[in-house]
Amino acid sequence: LPIFQGIRLTHQPSPWIGDYSWLLLTPVTGEISGDTLFYRQSSYNFERAIFNPHYLRIFSERYQIETQLSPTCYGASIQLRQIQGKNLSLYVHAADDLTLEQVDHRTIDIRQSGLTETNKSPLAMFTALTFSVEILSIKQEGQDWRIDLAGAEAQVQLATSFISKEQALLNLPKQDFEDTQTNAKASWEDLLGHFDVVETGPVDRTFFDHCLYRLFLFPQTFYEVNEQGESSHMDLASGTIKPGLLFTNNGFWD
């Protein structure tokens, strides 16, 4: 069976080139015998999993946890369900140094900072997590963090920001999981529907959509909108926040 190590928030357009500001979230239950990713991973049944641009569903055989995810522009909405009624826990893992701060009984701020291939100074990313159930405890294990939750089912709202922790909280999804999934599906259908394909065989449309999906998969929106509706962005050349829009791309020729 294939291995499931968690949901990875990534900025890597291809395995051939490096990643930056990545974060791995691994849902588990109970005590873990070691403090590395090897001890947290689980097998899953590929035939029962769903991998769509707007929706992911995967079932962890080891922990009997169903994980569902739908993306947003700055994050995602996640549904976790432990089918035996055991309390959920969530591990947070990254290559960068992580700092966690509990904002209230259901909200966590994460800050990570690390060097990239092009930046002269470390790039900081802020992540906000809100849970539909209360947080029982937070503890550091090695360089990682474990979040214990008071329930076997939880909806997790996630958002990131390269500006501030306050902006990350503002970027959190405002809708429930079902509405987030509906909006994500509509967004992808709009992007993939920009072109008409004259098909000469059954695989033409599928292959074209696959290539177009990969083109749009890399995050290109690098600006964020504050409470006043004003756009700003992290200027990577100076390491300062500047007003206005900024778009990126991966610059990858393959």
Give the ranges of each region predicted by the language model.
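Accessory carbohydrate-recognition regions in carbohydrate-active enzymes
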Residues: 1-254
